[in-house]
A protein has these predicted regions:
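Hydrophobic alpha-helical segments, principally membrane-spanning helices and signal/leader peptides
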Residues: 56-57, 79
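Catalytic core of bacterial c-di-GMP phosphodiesterases, primarily the EAL and HD-GYP domains
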Residues: 1-56
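Short loop/turn elements that form and flank the Walker-type P-loop nucleotide-binding site
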Residues: 37, 63-64
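EAL-family c-di-GMP phosphodiesterase catalytic domain
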Residues: 2, 20, 43-50, 67, ...
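Donor nucleotide-activated moiety binding/catalytic core segment of transferases
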Residues: 58, 62
Length: 167
């Protein structure tokens, strides 16, 4: 399965909460899995406790993989300080935040300022072709939502390479 992700240069993201991060911190086998599988991204929820403070667990995870993302940014639980404290590989915008602000004239300024702290911005809530075009038009690094078909991991090899490159 790792061959698929590596061949297409795509990432497989996994949502983790505080307890899961603690488990990874204490489990050498999972740490090795993350080190040896560069296509796995860890999405840390914005609900992670004290996200804006120094945190030895997040710092440790950042030593295991370059693919640590902050999830649900804009839902109101993290400040810019959280982005300054940790050098995340990507920031995923909260679905409601993206859908509320994407058509406002100041949205590109918000994205531009976020990119100063983390160049890879992902939009959650891309539900149709218009949202997808908008996310590409403002230079977002990635998009997630119902616009993209969901398939079981066991069928991932069936994804058409042309479809992936057209995104």
């Amino acid at each position: 399965m790792s061959i698929f992700f590596e061949r297409h240069n795509i990432l497989c993201s996994i949502n983790v909460d505080y307890d899961t991060c603690l488990y990874i911190y204490g489990n050498k086998q999972i740490q090795e899995l993350l080190i040896n599988n560069k296509f796995i991204a860890i999405e840390i929820s914005e609900n992670y406790p004290d996200l804006s403070d120094e945190d030895y667990i997040i710092s440790f995870l950042l030593t295991l993989t370059d693919n640590v993302w902050l999830d649900d940014f804009g839902s109101g639980n993290a400040t810019m300080k959280a982005l300054i404290k940790n050098k995340y590989h990507a920031i995923k915008l909260d679905k409601s935040f993206f859908q509320e602000h994407m058509i406002k004239p100041h949205f590109d300024v918000i994205i531009s300022n976020l990119k100063k702290l983390c160049p890879n911005i992902i939009a959650e809530g891309v539900e149709n072709i218009d949202c997808h075009k908008l996310s590409k038009g403002i230079g977002l690094w990635g998009a997630q939502g119902y616009f993209f078909p969901s398939i079981p991991l066991t069928e991932i090899e069936s994804i058409d390479s042309k479809w992936l490159s057209d995104l």
